[in-house]
């Protein structure tokens, strides 16, 4: 519940907390590893680390964060101060996104005894022009996201060593004798994928602001079944980079993020790589594959399914770019 501080009537403060059955070091490590947040926290879509802190001694970080709030994608720049010894992380938005005029706070990881931790998440914020409607909007977003982040942090930390089996990263690449811009165009224009890719049967794409795309896609499997996924993509044309986060994932997964990277090789070719970061859902694995299914079996099946679709997309992107160069 937000309250107004006595010394600054327009500044609101909130506190959320949760108890986690995991050591402080494990919990703090997940909070400190901000590049891994999209795989842990539901609201976080993507994080660019602009300035990095020393992982052992702490210090300041500068970040650019994209996250969902009240159903919309917001982007802002934040500075964090990490203190590994105290198990705290201070944060302050340096370039907020309207209707936020200012936003900051702190993560605290306290010992709760017997190898457990208490996590406290503090926020303070102001709305642009102290608008009451905006204050209510921000309050709802802070409350919803804080509860979601703490629950996700608890789940990830309490997985312990099992998390190493459930969480994995892989990639597929193609070398293209074409222009990076043409490869990017193919990947960016996902609205045309149903006409260009055999495994995409339907795709609705909206772009409310340049570079931020919402995708609702039906993918056809080799057995004829159709699977629906929804995603948010953040596109960086100047960097040859598209990152995405699936909001609706297949039953065996609890999370899936990825990125398309386009890298000029200097000899007239480019390397295009599709990266996937996947977290399996143990209960979902049992539902999808049977009660005796192991994480290793699920990893292999997910790797094959996602890798097959990515490789197909990469091959068609290569053909598109190479044919464009041949016509030039």
Model-derived features with residue positions:
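Hydrophobic beta-strand positions in extracellular immunoglobulin-like domains
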Residues: 20, 123-125, 176, 219, ...
């Amino acid at each position: 519940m937000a309250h107004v501080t006595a010394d600054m009537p327009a500044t609101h403060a909130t506190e959320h907390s949760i108890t986690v059955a995991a050591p402080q070091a494990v919990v703090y490590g997940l909070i400190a590893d901000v590049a891994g947040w999209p795989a842990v926290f539901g609201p976080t879509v993507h994080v660019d680390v602009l300035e990095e802190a020393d992982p052992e001694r702490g210090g300041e970080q500068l970040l650019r964060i994209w996250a969902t709030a009240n159903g919309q994608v917001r982007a802002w720049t934040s500075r964090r101060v990490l203190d590994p010894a105290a198990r705290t992380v201070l944060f302050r938005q340096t370039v907020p996104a309207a209707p936020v005029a200012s936003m900051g706070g702190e993560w605290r990881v306290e010992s709760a005894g017997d190898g457990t931790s208490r996590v406290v998440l503090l926020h303070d914020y102001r709305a642009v022009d102290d608008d009451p409607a905006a204050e209510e909007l921000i309050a709802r977003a802070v409350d919803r996201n804080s509860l979601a982040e703490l629950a996700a942090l608890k789940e990830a930390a309490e997985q312990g060593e099992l998390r190493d089996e459930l969480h994995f990263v892989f990639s597929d690449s193609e070398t293209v004798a074409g222009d990076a811009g043409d490869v990017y165009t193919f990947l960016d224009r996902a609205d045309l994928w149903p006409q260009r890719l055999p495994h995409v049967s339907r795709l609705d794409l909206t772009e409310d602001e340049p570079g931020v795309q919402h995708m609702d896609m039906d993918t056809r499997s080799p057995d004829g079944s159709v699977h629906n996924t929804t995603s948010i993509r953040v596109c960086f044309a100047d960097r040859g980079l598209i990152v995405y986060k699936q909001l609706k994932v297949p039953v065996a997964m609890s999370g899936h993020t990825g990125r398309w990277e386009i890298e000029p090789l200097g000899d007239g070719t480019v390397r295009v790589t599709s990266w996937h970061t996947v977290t399996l859902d143990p209960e979902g694995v049992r539902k999808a594959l049977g009660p005796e299914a192991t994480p290793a079996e699920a990893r292999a099946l997910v790797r094959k399914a996602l890798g097959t679709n990515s490789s197909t997309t990469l091959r068609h992107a290569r053909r598109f770019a190479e044919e464009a160069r041949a016509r030039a």
